[in-house]
Amino acid sequence: LLSGRGGASLAGLAMLRYLTERTSASDKPPVATAGDPALAVLTQDTLKAGYEAANAEDLYQPTTGRLSGPTPFSFVAGAMPVVRDENVSANVLMGDFGPEIALVTEAAERSDVPTLGGTDDLPAQAVLYAAAQEPLIGEELFAAGAYLGAGPSHTASLTVQDILRWLLILFLL
């Protein structure tokens, strides 16, 4: 979370908040796993905020946000049983993953669970492109909030990025 790749994790938290608000009262509420202790705490807080925004505070269970493992492979080993055993309806993978994420997508495929995935790691993007039903390629990971209409700040950030790109292009010319 505190590394240079923490932005992908923060984008994943924004997606988690959006999904929690919309699915908190369903028969299959969200379950979130994290591969970093600080991110696991933020995951629990994001889940709680999503339940509060949906006026479903009484349905929130702190155990639905968890640390599945602090290293890449221990994270995958802890996330695979969640997909397989906890009766999830969709598998959303957003954050800083390596190619080992293929093991989670395989577990989802075996459980007939659709996968949406996005990461900032190029080899993992290639894996998700091949294995996920809905891969997010490149900066789509960071634009996912705007795609879903999660708020005006997401749309504004994309507009600012586009303006800065055009200014950089004009400067280079």
Please identify what each model-predicted range represents.
Residues 2-10, 36-40, 94-101, 122:
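Gly/Ser/Thr-rich loops at beta-strand to alpha-helix junctions
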Residues 9-27:
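Histidine-anchored nucleotide/phosphate-binding helix
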Residues 9-10, 14, 53, 72, ...:
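Elongated extramembrane "stalk/tether" segments
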Residues 123-125, 129-173:
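C-terminal functional extensions of proteins
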Residues 68-133:
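Long, charge-patterned amphipathic alpha-helical coiled-coil/hairpin "stalk" segments used as oligomerization
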Residues 22-24, 28-76:
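Long, charge-dense
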Residues 11-13, 45-48, 105-109:
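Short, glycine/charged-enriched secondary-structure capping and boundary segments
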Residues 15-18, 75-78, 143:
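Well-ordered alpha-helical segments embedded in enzymatic catalytic cores
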